[in-house]
């Protein structure tokens, strides 16, 4: 195991929305996410994707919301998932294999304005096809910038997930960039906004990949979904 993959053993820092996990569950998740992880492939067509033989969790969100940083933070690597220098330029669904047991899936960002409408529609259609066609998809984590909360384009994405009947959970990113009271407020507002959405998991988790906030709980949530169930 490389030094980069070794996750430091440290007590979890809880933020609003954190689940009630035991210390043993948090530690087991830390160990699981310290196992080897690698980029498998980027797919631009459904027939080019890996087989549906392993559980998957996917990450969605507006361009520049911090998807790459979150994925890298989960596995404690800096450059596994690479962010595009220009918003909206990631046009593939990227698959990463963790511990030979779970796939982490990075979906193309939405809500960008620097690509043509036809190109935007093409890879948003790819994302929708993935959501409808993956029986092994355990959950979609929809990332929302804690500084801005839910935007219209986010609500449209949630509508699509509801229609597809795909289980999803809101994860607030960059929670370290605002005051704790503001984090509490945006968590409460977001939970209220999704309360009547059938496919939404009711708990909103606040995180910061830069500070490690909420990451132990998110790891434990993924392990519970993909390994324990």
UniProtKB/Swiss-Prot annotation:
Record-listed GTP binding positions: 61-68, 88-92, 106-109, 173-176, 207-209
Gene Ontology molecular function terms on file: GTP binding; metal ion binding
Entry keyword annotation includes Secreted: no
Pfam families the record matches: MMR_HSR1
Function: Necessary for normal cell division and for the maintenance of normal septation.
Protein family per UniProt: Belongs to the TRAFAC class TrmE-Era-EngA-EngB-Septin-like GTPase superfamily. EngB GTPase family.
HAMAP family membership: GTPase_EngB
Protein name: Probable GTP-binding protein EngB
Species this protein is from: Caulobacter vibrioides (strain NA1000 / CB15N) (Caulobacter crescentus)
């Amino acid at each position: 195991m490389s030094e980069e993959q070794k996750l430091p053993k440290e007590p979890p820092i809880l933020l609003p929305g954190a689940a009630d996990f035991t210390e043993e569950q948090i530690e087991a998740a830390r160990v699981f996410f310290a196992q080897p992880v690698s980029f498998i492939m980027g797919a631009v067509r459904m027939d080019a994707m890996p087989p549906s033989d392993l559980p998957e969790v996917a990450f969605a969100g507006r361009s520049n919301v911090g998807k790459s940083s979150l994925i890298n933070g989960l596995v404690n690597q800096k450059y596994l998932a690479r962010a595009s220098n220009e918003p909206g330029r990631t046009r593939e669904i990227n698959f990463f294999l963790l511990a030979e047991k779970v796939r982490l899936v990075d979906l193309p960002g939405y809500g960008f304005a620097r690509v043509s409408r036809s190109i935007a529609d093409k890879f948003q259609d790819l994302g929708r096809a993935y959501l409808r066609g993956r029986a092994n998809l355990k959950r979609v984590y929809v990332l929302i910038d804690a500084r801005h909360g839910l935007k219209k384009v986010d609500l449209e994405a949630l509508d699509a997930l509801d229609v597809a009947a795909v289980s999803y959970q809101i994860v607030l990113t960059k929670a370290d960039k605002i005051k704790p009271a503001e984090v509490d407020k945006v968590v409460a507002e977001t939970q209220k906004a999704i309360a009547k959405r059938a496919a939404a998991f009711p708990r909103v988790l606040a995180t910061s990949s830069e500070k490690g906030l909420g990451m132990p709980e998110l790891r434990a949530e993924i392990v519970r979904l993909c390994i324990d169930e």
